[in-house]
C-alpha cells in the first residue's frame, strides 16, 4: 500500500477513536471491508479446504474427508486476506490486501514460512507457466507482479496493465495463458444489456436490466 493510502487509513482510525468516550480497549479493530476475490480453495491431492478469514486476519484450514468441513488449523496471516491459492498439496499463498503482502503457508505444519512484499493492494494470485511462476495482481498500482516460487528472494518481474484495479486471475487449461479481470477497464463494456444510446455505440446507462 502506498504511503498516501496508509496515511488515509491511519487518519480514519484516529478520527474514529477520537469520537469514542473513554479509552480504546486493546482488542479494538477496524473492519476495512476489503472485497473477497478468491476466498475459498479446495486443495488438490488432499482433503483440505482453505478459507480466508478476512476480518480476523487468518487462514482457516478444514478437513473435508468426512464430507463435512471440520476445523483443522487456523493460521495468522496479514491484514485482510482476500484470496488464497494452493500451489500444491502442502503449500498455499494468501493475498493480504491491506498488509500489501503474500503469506506463504505450510499446510502440513500450519505456519507462515515466508512473507513476500508486494505493490499496493494485492488482489489475487495464480500459478502458471513452465517453469512455474506466481502471478499477483495489484489493484493499487495497476500491475501484475511475477514471482519465482522456487526462489522467492528473487526480484519479481513487473507487467503494467491498461485499466484500473486488476483483481481476479485465471489461467488457460494448459497453463500457458493468464487472464486478469479488471474492475475499471475503461473499454466501454458492461454486463448490463441496456441497449445502445443514440447510435454512438455506447451502452445506455443506467438501465439496470437485461433487454
Task: Annotate each predicted stretch with a short phrase.
Residues 1-9:
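Bacterial N-terminal signal peptides that target proteins for export
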Residues 8-19:
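Bacterial N-terminal signal peptides
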Residues 22-211:
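Predominantly soluble domains enriched in secretory-pathway, periplasmic, or organellar proteins
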Amino acid at each position: 500500500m502506498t504511503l498516501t493510502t496508509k496515511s488515509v487509513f491511519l487518519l480514519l482510525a484516529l478520527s474514529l477513536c477520537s469520537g469514542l468516550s473513554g479509552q480504546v480497549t486493546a482488542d479494538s479493530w477496524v473492519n476495512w471491508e476489503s472485497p473477497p476475490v478468491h476466498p475459498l480453495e479446495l486443495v488438490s491431492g488432499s482433503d483440505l479446504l482453505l478459507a480466508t478469514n478476512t476480518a480476523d486476519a487468518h487462514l482457516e484450514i478444514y478437513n473435508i474427508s468426512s464430507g463435512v468441513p471440520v476445523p483443522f488449523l487456523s493460521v495468522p496471516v496479514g491484514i485482510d486476506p482476500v484470496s488464497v491459492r494452493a500451489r500444491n498439496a502442502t503449500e498455499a499463498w494468501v493475498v493480504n490486501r491491506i498488509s500489501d503482502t503474500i503469506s506463504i503457508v505450510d499446510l502440513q505444519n500450519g505456519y507462515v514460512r515466508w512473507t513476500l512484499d508486494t505493490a499496493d493492494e494485492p488482489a489475487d494470485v495464480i500459478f502458471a507457466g513452465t517453469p512455474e511462476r506466481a502471478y499477483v495482481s495489484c489493484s493499487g498500482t495497476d500491475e501484475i507482479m511475477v514471482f519465482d516460487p522456487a526462489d522467492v528472494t528473487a526480484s519479481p518481474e513487473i507487467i503494467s496493465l491498461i485499466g484500473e484495479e486488476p483483481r481476479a486471475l485465471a489461467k488457460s487449461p494448459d497453463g500457458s495463458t493468464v487472464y486478469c479481470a479488471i474492475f475499471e477497464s475503461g473499454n466501454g463494456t458492461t454486463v448490463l444489456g441496456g441497449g445502445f444510446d443514440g447510435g454512438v455505440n455506447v451502452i445506455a446507462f443506467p438501465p439496470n436490466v437485461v433487454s
